[in-house]
């Protein structure tokens, strides 16, 4: 098939008529499909439901001599701190095990910077005239919502095949008002990029003008391969310490896509000094998080090796879904030259870059045909994609049969939007 840009006006008009007919057929099916967020599917949830059968007798609730049914240490039970240190490659004293969401810990970390300041802050950030933040784009919408909620000025930096454009990052951190940077370093959301060793090294050795700069390291997909073997990843905490930046990095992870979204365990890892400081502050707002759930996860996941074996089972469910989307894009979109897309081997998303000015229109057409997707612009600060071109696809929730229907709708809508943009 010809690329749309190589077609004559008459050829594009004929193609447009044919695609419109297909679109009307899809609309008539009365679909109601959702690919808006990276939610695990039912088969994945069924996989981990046995976790609820592990605590049945009174003695089951005792770990390291601690009865988790009672009050306890705010930073988490020792067994949970050991487990997540094993998974992340750091030390137990560098781990804070919280409640059901790493996002809550990210929000709390930024919040404490504003209300109390960090270890190396001259004053709480709420007393500063301006706070700026580096945001690699496309990126994670919920990260951007956190900093936006504090009135932070977000500065977009483009992603490359190796991670964020480090030349731009290194120029920006010379400004003392630049206080932090979001990162999803492994299988980035939404592109699935793995930061290169060189990029990670440059980030770890940065010398920001702000002494309390926060390198926010959301390692959400640290063990989330679906199309390859586990990829080992550097321990950013020890690397930062090596370059004299022990207190600069704040790493986050959770079991949201290992066990249950919204009912798993969220983790923050940082220097032991940072963990002690945050434990003191967080202990004012809570006596402690759900230790029973922490122990439940320790007993179910056991250690890194056992957790990776579980992730292989998740991968067997996820891989066919990603393949269904990529196969459809390869067949229906790639030959037409109207979009580019990444081929991730881990994470939870596929990033598609359509022709400038076509993302919103494509997704509006999808919605009209009964398919809900992540909103256009969500992958940029303030929800504003300057090119109106990036679309995030989340294949994980629907069964493959429904997913094939949804991606057929998407491809058809993308064709219509591209043809209208080119002129018919």
Please place each PLM-identified region on the residue numbering.
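Conserved PLP-binding active-site segment of the aspartate aminotransferase-like
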Residues: 351-356, 373-415
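Short, solvent-exposed loop/turn segments at secondary-structure junctions
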Residues: 38-42, 102-103, 139-141, 162, ...
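Conserved core segment of the aminotransferase class I/II
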Residues: 98, 238-319, 332, 419
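Short amphipathic alpha-helices in soluble, non-transmembrane regions
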Residues: 362-368, 406-411
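Conserved core of the PLP fold type I
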Residues: 60, 66-211, 222-244, 359, ...
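Conserved glycine-rich beta-strand-loop-beta hairpin in the small C-terminal domain of fold type I
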Residues: 312-326, 338-353
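N-terminal "arm"/small-domain region of PLP-dependent enzymes with the aminotransferase-like
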Residues: 2-75, 79-80, 85-86, 368-371
């Amino acid at each position: 098939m010809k690329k749309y840009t190589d077609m004559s006006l008459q050829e594009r008009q004929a193609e447009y008529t044919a695609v419109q007919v297909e679109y009307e057929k899809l609309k008539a099916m009365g679909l109601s499909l959702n690919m808006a967020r990276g939610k695990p599917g039912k088969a994945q949830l069924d996989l981990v439901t046995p976790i609820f059968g592990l605590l049945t007798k009174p003695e089951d609730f005792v770990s390291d001599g601690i009865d988790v049914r009672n009050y306890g240490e705010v930073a988490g039970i020792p067994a949970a701190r050991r487990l997540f240190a094993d998974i992340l490659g750091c030390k137990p004293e560098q781990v804070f095990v919280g409640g059901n969401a790493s996002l809550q810990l990210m929000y709390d970390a930024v919040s404490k910077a504003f209300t109390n300041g960090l270890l190396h802050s001259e004053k709480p950030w709420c007393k500063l005239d301006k706070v700026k933040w580096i945001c690699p784009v496309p990126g994670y919408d919920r990260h951007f919502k956190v900093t936006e909620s504090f009135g932070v000025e977000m500065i977009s930096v483009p992603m490359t095949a190796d991670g964020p454009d480090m030349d731009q990052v290194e120029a920006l951190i010379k400004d003392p008002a630049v206080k932090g940077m979001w990162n999803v370093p492994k299988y980035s959301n939404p592109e699935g990029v793995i930061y290169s060793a060189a990029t990670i090294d440059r980030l770890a050795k940065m010398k920001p003008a702000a002494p309390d700069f926060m390198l926010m390291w959301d390692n959400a997909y640290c063990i989330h391969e679906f199309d390859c073997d586990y990829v080992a990843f550097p321990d950013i905490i020890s690397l930062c310490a090596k370059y004299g930046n022990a207190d600069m990095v704040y790493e986050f992870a959770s079991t949201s896509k290992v066990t249950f979204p919204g009912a798993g365990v969220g983790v923050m890892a940082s220097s032991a000094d940072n963990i002690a400081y945050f434990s003191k502050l967080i202990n004012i707002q809570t006596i402690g998080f759900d230790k029973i759930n922490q122990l439940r996860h320790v007993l179910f996941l056991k250690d890194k090796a056992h957790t990776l074996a579980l992730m292989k089972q998740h991968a067997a469910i996820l891989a066919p879904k990603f393949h269904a989307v990529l196969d459809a894009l390869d067949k229906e979109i790639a030959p037409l030259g109207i979009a580019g897309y990444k081929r991730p081997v881990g994470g939870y998303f596929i990033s598609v870059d359509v022709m400038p000015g076509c993302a919103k229109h494509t997704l509006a057409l999808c919605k009209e045909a009964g398919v809900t997707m992540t909103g256009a612009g969500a992958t940029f600060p303030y929800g504003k994609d300057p090119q109106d071109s990036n679309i995030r696809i989340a294949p994980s929730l629907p069964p493959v049969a429904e997913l094939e229907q949804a991606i057929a709708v998407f491809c058809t809508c993308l064709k219509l939007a591209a043809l209208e943009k080119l002129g018919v």
